[in-house]
Regions:
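A short secondary-structure junction signal
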Residues: 19-22, 46-51, 70-76, 92-95, ...
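PLP-dependent aminotransferase class I/II
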Residues: 145, 164-179
Length: 192
């Protein structure tokens, strides 16, 4: 983002090697921000936001690549959700974008046509040849999720699997999970 605008880092957990999600009370939001971006689940560090940041009238933009479809999400709280399919939806090369209507077309003048969501919205997501195999696989995944109880069932399943792993790590005299318990990912369980 620094190539296109002034960036304000509103919060960081660098002080503890990125092992927790900074509390909302510690965030220093800019009143004139164009948007606030965060990553819902940090894959390598295994830190997950189990809450949605409150940004008032400032659009909230979220990278959900590693935890989309892992639990129900109220998309109305976001200006934009984007996710690469390669973690939970299908093969690499497919990206899901859920954009609030009032944000369509708000781009810098030099934005390439393929990076302007208005282009895709006006062409029903088929401005160019879509990745048909990826879409087919994603459709199979969506059907499987529905047949297995939907997103609420996926969340239950993920909580149960993560609880088993974390219980083992917490009682281990050898392995350690460095992530703050309240912010542990349900999708990625790092340990040393």
């Amino acid at each position: 983002a620094k190539q296109y605008c002034q960036v304000n880092v509103v919060a960081s957990s660098e002080d503890k090697s990125f092992t927790y999600a900074p509390a909302q009370a510690d965030w220093k939001l800019s009143k004139d921000a164009a948007y606030v971006h965060y990553t819902a689940n940090e894959t390598i560090g295994g830190v997950e936001f189990h809450w949605v940041p409150q940004t008032g009238d400032v659009p909230l933009v979220c990278d959900m690549s590693s935890n989309i479809l892992s639990k129900p999400v109220d998309v109305s709280k976001y200006g934009l959700i984007y996710a690469g399919a390669q973690k939970n939806i299908g093969p690499a090369g497919l990206t899901i974008a859920i954009l609030r209507d009032d944000l369509i077309g708000q781009v810098l003048p030099k934005t390439p046509v393929m990076l302007d969501y208005k282009t895709h919205a006006e062409n029903e997501s088929m401005y160019n040849t879509p990745p048909t195999y990826g879409i087919y696989i994603a459709g199979l995944v969506f059907q499987w999720i529905k047949q297995n109880g939907g997103l609420a069932a996926m969340e239950k399943r993920n909580r149960e699997k993560a609880a088993l792993l974390y219980a083992f790590l917490d009682q281990s005299n050898f392995f350690v999970s460095p992530v703050a318990k309240a912010d542990r990912s349900l999708m990625n369980v790092p340990f040393t």
